[in-house]
């Protein structure tokens, strides 16, 4: 195994991509590798509060990341600097467990699912309502509703939460079901290890004999030809046997580079749904649920302040809440909006960029083509109205974080498939139509000046 300090740097690098910036900087950035005792990696946390928080909330993620990098199962032990406490390095009992190279699927489904990620703990909003409904339908009737279910969206918006929720629901209602959740990175590493150890059949038996396969971050298969080949056959085997497949990505299948066309087409067999950033009301609801789950007493004005400042994704939103609570605990002061501002000053940009709304787009497009705002929501199909409306839908998809149903609502309650059609039509025309390119450039320049 490589030097433990180099290993820990790699682990931190991977985790930094997976969690919010506030969470990483608050809990993990200042940690250091201490030693390797048997099968236990000992990590130094900056203080007792951080040690306890890391142990209860991040041990599982860290162990998973170490396994993804090294192929070895290591337990993790957190200590604090000797000058803060006389910490005895007692190894957890899990450190004595010997790892099997390829365990049966039933050996790990529950342990691979985060117990906090259930449908009950998922906060539904306009940006994730469709994805939630599709996930619940799949959980209630695996391989009968949508197969595969492909969920895409930015980092920290709830894709992984929904995948784990599906797994929990299936196991709760059918305890004998073989449910496997893993990242595409882990799938790749296990496949490489299987080839190296000359045990490909063990690997295939593990993943081709499950009832539900939940595979996260499929975009990381891009460019890995052998792994794509293996996953292609795994997909076919499961689909032919009516086993449920759920896939997540940060982008839709057609936008994943160097993904084989045969995989891309199979990902499009079922239902593709996106998740977009939560609106203000949803962000406040998320903070309330998180505070209740963790037993935090947070004033409403503080939650409103955090929700107004952090609008990118759920991980950063919850990370900001944790940072405020940690800051309050460490300096022993009551949580107020002023304290929250102080705690978050390093992660909130001083000047937030102007957010373009659908209404902004409709107004500017309407002025450009000399049509009324109400025409965007009307049923008129004349070209003088329909074409600008399609351009506005295209720009709403490109320049806002609104979901397809939300965009459709803002254009007179149109179906999300109408929005998809408009986006695809304008995208195709832009490749050859110089006049349309000119219109779009002028409209976007006006939007920048708002």
Curated annotation (Swiss-Prot):
Region (Domain III, AAA+ region): 112-328
Residues that bind ATP: 156, 158-160
Annotated spans, Domain I, interacts with DnaA modulators: 1-84
The entry's keywords: ATP-binding, Cytoplasm, DNA replication, DNA-binding, Lipid-binding, Nucleotide-binding
Pfam family, one: Bac_DnaA
Entry GO CC: cytoplasm; plasma membrane
InterPro entries, sorted: AAA+_ATPase (IPR003593), Chromosome_initiator_DnaA (IPR001957), Chromosome_initiator_DnaA-like (IPR020591), Chromosome_initiator_DnaA_CS (IPR018312), DnaA_C (IPR013159), DnaA_dom (IPR013317), DnaA_N_dom (IPR024633), DnaA_N_sf (IPR038454)
UniProt xrefs under Gene3D superfamilies: 1.10.1750.10, 1.10.8.60, 3.30.300.180, P-loop containing nucleotide triphosphate hydrolases
SUPFAM superfamilies from the UniProt entry: P-loop containing nucleoside triphosphate hydrolases (SSF52540), TrpR-like (SSF48295)
Domain notes for this protein: Domain I is involved in oligomerization and binding regulators, domain II is flexibile and of varying length in different bacteria, domain III forms the AAA+ region, while domain IV binds dsDNA.
Known role: Plays an essential role in the initiation and regulation of chromosomal replication. ATP-DnaA binds to the origin of replication (oriC) to initiate formation of the DNA replication initiation complex once per cell cycle. Binds the DnaA box (a 9 base pair repeat at the origin) and separates the double-stranded (ds)DNA. Forms a right-handed helical filament on oriC DNA; dsDNA binds to the exterior of the filament while single-stranded (ss)DNA is stabiized in the filament's interior.
Family: Belongs to the DnaA family.
Protein name according to UniProt: Chromosomal replication initiator protein DnaA
